[in-house]
């Protein structure tokens, strides 16, 4: 599959694992439903991943004041726990974890490779102009789609 291309119909894709990812936003029930469809068809597990954003560097060096706060970590853990429970209620094997990264796109794609996922599902905002979108954190799912070498299903946030 070509990076950035529209993914195939979820009912035609055989997968060994699915990554249900978020750059920091809550994972929508619609995204959970698509991940469930993909996983049930092949009996695959779903790995849930969220990112607690690291806000940058100070003079080129990591700065503890720019790391996620305890509250931010807890919020992301709650999103993962809620999503894993929803997947397990649907009868899908699921696990999850939270990462901390400045560049969520690179980490999500790297985790998908490491976990040998054949598809990524993310909740996303409407796509913006690519030039403007590159400056917006909310366009991270679109950047994941452009960079990933597996199908990326973007579910528009309600």
Predicted regions and their residues:
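Active-site phosphate/pyrophosphate- and oxyanion-stabilizing loops and adjacent acidic/basic residues
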Residues: 36, 109, 142
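Short, flexible loop segments at boundaries between secondary-structure elements
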Residues: 142-158
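Short, hinge-like loop/turn segments at secondary-structure boundaries
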Residues: 63-67, 113-115, 138-140
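General small-molecule cofactor/ligand-binding pocket signal
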Residues: 47-49, 95-99, 153-155
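A short acidic, glycine-rich active-site loop
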Residues: 65-78
């Amino acid at each position: 599959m070509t990076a950035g291309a529209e993914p195939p119909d979820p009912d035609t894709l055989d997968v060994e694992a699915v990554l249900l990812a978020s750059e920091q936003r809550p994972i929508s029930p619609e995204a959970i439903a698509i991940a469930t469809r993909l996983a049930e068809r092949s009996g695959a597990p779903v790995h849930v991943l969220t990112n607690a954003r690291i806000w940058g560097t100070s003079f080129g060096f990591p700065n503890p004041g720019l790391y996620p706060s305890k509250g931010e970590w807890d919020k992301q853990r709650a999103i993962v726990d809620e999503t894993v429970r929803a997947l397990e209620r649907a009868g899908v094997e699921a696990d999850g974890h939270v990462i901390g990264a400045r560049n969520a796109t690179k980490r999500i794609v790297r985790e998908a490779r490491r976990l040998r996922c054949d598809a990524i599902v993310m909740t996303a905002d409407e796509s913006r102009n690519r030039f403007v979108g590159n400056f917006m954190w909310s366009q991270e799912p679109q950047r994941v789609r452009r960079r990933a070498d597996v199908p990326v299903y973007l579910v528009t946030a309600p």
